[in-house]
């Protein structure tokens, strides 16, 4: 857990430099725990438009998102609608950190109703993420709040 002190949507001046500095702090925390990337950043929906603001006045047309994506090892930034406001997850995208467990592959289910006059379909699957950690309880996920 890395505490940020100021939320990204509360920063008035120098917002771009502050956010990039905090992302670099997340990266260093991951490196200190021996997780070397590649990483994915997950943000709440209240940060989505903030990352589309200009990085600074000297580089108009360059957004904060574009500046973050220039940091080595960061593969992408995704919005998680259900992530609480002012929380950021920095996740190493490897099978030793997180993997997808498939309980049931993609299936089509078909049935008939109303005297075989109406055919209905549903598609279902069972998939859950499994968060993993090493024997020292390090998980490769850095939480910024």
Model-identified regions with their sequence ranges:
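Long, contiguous amphipathic alpha-helices that act as assembly "spine/axial" helices in icosahedral shell
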Residues: 1-7, 30-43, 114-128
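Short secondary-structure capping micro-motifs at structural edges
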Residues: 20-31, 64
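Hydrophobic alpha-helical segments and helix-packing faces
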Residues: 16-19, 34, 61
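Alpha-helical scaffold segments that mediate packing/assembly in large oligomeric complexes
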Residues: 1-25
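Intrinsic disorder/low-complexity detector
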Residues: 9-12, 40, 89
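Sequence/fold signature of self-assembling virion shell proteins
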Residues: 52-145
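Structural motif
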Residues: 43-47, 93
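Surface-exposed polar/charged interaction patches
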Residues: 29, 33, 71-74
């Amino acid at each position: 857990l890395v505490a940020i002190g100021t939320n990204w949507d509360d920063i008035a001046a120098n917002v771009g430099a502050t956010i990039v500095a905090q992302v670099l702090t997340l990266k260093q925390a991951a490196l200190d725990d021996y997780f070397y990337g590649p990483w994915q950043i997950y943000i709440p929906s209240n940060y989505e438009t903030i990352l589309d603001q200009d990085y600074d006045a000297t580089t108009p047309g360059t957004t904060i998102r574009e500046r973050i994506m220039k940091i080595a090892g960061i593969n992408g930034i995704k919005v998680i609608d259900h992530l609480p406001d002012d929380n950021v997850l920095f996740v190493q995208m490897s099978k030793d950190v997180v993997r997808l467990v498939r309980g049931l592959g993609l299936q089509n289910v078909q049935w008939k109703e109303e005297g075989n006059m109406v055919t209905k379909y549903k598609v279902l699957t069972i998939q859950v993420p499994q968060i993993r950690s090493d024997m020292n309880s390090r998980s490769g996920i850095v939480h910024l709040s």
